[in-house]
Amino acid sequence: MKVQVEELSPIEKKLSIEVDNARVAEELSRAYSNLGRQVRLPGFRQGKVPRRILEQRFRDQVEDEVIQRVVQSAYVEAIREHNVEVVATPQVTNSGLKPNTPFTFEARVEVKPKVEAKDYVELPLTKSDTAVTDEQVNEQLERMRQSMARLEPVTDRDTAASGDYVTVDFDATVDGQPFAGSKAEGITVQVQPGELVESKIAALEGVKVGESKDIDYAFPQEYRVEEVRGKTARFHITLKGVQKEIVPELNDDFAKQSGVAQSIDELRTKLREDMEKARKSQVEGEEREALMKALLERNTFDVPRAMVERAMDSMLRGALQQLQRSGVDPRQLNLDFNRLREDMREKALQEVKGTLLFESIAQKEGIQASDADVDARIEQLANEAGQPVAVVQKYFKGADERLGLSLRLREEKTIEFLRSRAKYS
């Protein structure tokens, strides 16, 4: 087999490949033999159909299959032999099969660019404080109190007051016509200023249980139900009950109810630790972005479209999975997934370039993640998840999963190296 590699650009190559006739003839012979064992033709016993008859009837089909096999195997051999780092499916053109003639084809491929990072010492960074104040801990405790509040019926009055939670039935129309979700019973809303679609209706203040009130509401342009976007609806709302919010006191019982700690002091300590960990992660993310931005300003190069498209797909999957983890079904949001994905293009481009620059710096500086590093991270992940190490190890048992973790650790080490050489302000 003969292979000629031509560089069309730093991100595209053309492989011209010639496969000798003997190899093609062997593939043809194997294909006709397999076909002969399977095909049934009148006048011939199965497995005894002469090849010339098979050629007359099935030549085009057999040659197409042989071309596909020869192209696939020869292409894989060629990129391995010449160390071509392909990032997308090749565009192939071929000469077709001709008797006693070598088979030739060309494959145009997008390739991973060879990036040589420069000017990566003394990148500008802003010093950030990861400390958590007592005030921030208290604010988080208050949020926890509010989230653990319960509702109790109001017994000393039957009129809704500001801040109350009320149970209502409603029936709504737009231009006199109902719409999707326009009718509901037993819905709880709060009597306070805000958006009706956020379950806040200040206009119910002063309404008595059993009374009804008509309220006009203009839906936002981005509302999830397309038929009422930007339109004004009339809601006929009937008050069914009044409740008040009971917020628990900050004491040991509250800590136990949270399921996090056995005392309020222990809860404060754990909250501070979690908040400091979250703040540290936030700062690290911000510094990674700042380092990447500075590197991209100092290093200009092109990347294959396929790498960007793949990054866009990954980012979209991540965004949708985050919604699902938050208990939101993306399918219920009427999202334009194509537009959402396209909006990620610039971010994906920067991410691909930044990752390549981090890889280049790691290679130049001899930064690696050892097997011991990978094992230590797996143990850390297991401890954080409260799972046995063996369970988490199973997830990283595959070569691809372990390699992915190793590359992530190498990038973390590279970023730490850049931080140690950065110029802080």
UniProtKB/Swiss-Prot annotation:
UniProt keywords, alphabetically: Cell cycle, Cell division, Chaperone, Cytoplasm, Isomerase, Rotamase
Family from the record: Belongs to the FKBP-type PPIase family. Tig subfamily.
GO molecular function: peptidyl-prolyl cis-trans isomerase activity; protein folding chaperone; ribosome binding
Notes concerning its domains: Consists of 3 domains; the N-terminus binds the ribosome, the middle domain has PPIase activity, while the C-terminus has intrinsic chaperone activity on its own.
Name of the protein described by the UniProt record: Trigger factor
Compartment(s): Cytoplasm
SUPFAM superfamilies: FKBP-like, Triger factor/SurA peptide-binding domain-like, Trigger factor ribosome-binding domain
InterPro entries: PPIase_dom_sf, PPIase_FKBP_dom, Trig_fac, Trigger_fac_C, Trigger_fac_C_sf, Trigger_fac_ribosome-bd_bac, Trigger_fac_ribosome-bd_sf, Trigger_fact/SurA_dom_sf
Enzyme class, UniProt record, top EC level: isomerase
EC number assigned by the record: 5.2.1.8
Catalyzed chemical reaction(s): [protein]-peptidylproline (omega=180) = [protein]-peptidylproline (omega=0)
Residues in PPIase FKBP-type domain copies: 163-248
PANTHER family: TRIGGER FACTOR CHAPERONE AND PEPTIDYL-PROLYL CIS/TRANS ISOMERASE (PTHR30560), TRIGGER FACTOR-LIKE PROTEIN TIG, CHLOROPLASTIC (PTHR30560:SF3)
Organism per entry: Myxococcus xanthus (strain DK1622)
GO BP field: 'de novo' cotranslational protein folding; cell division; chaperone-mediated protein folding; protein transport; protein unfolding
Function recorded in the entry: Involved in protein export. Acts as a chaperone by maintaining the newly synthesized protein in an open conformation. Functions as a peptidyl-prolyl cis-trans isomerase.
A cellular component annotation (GO) from this entry: cytoplasm
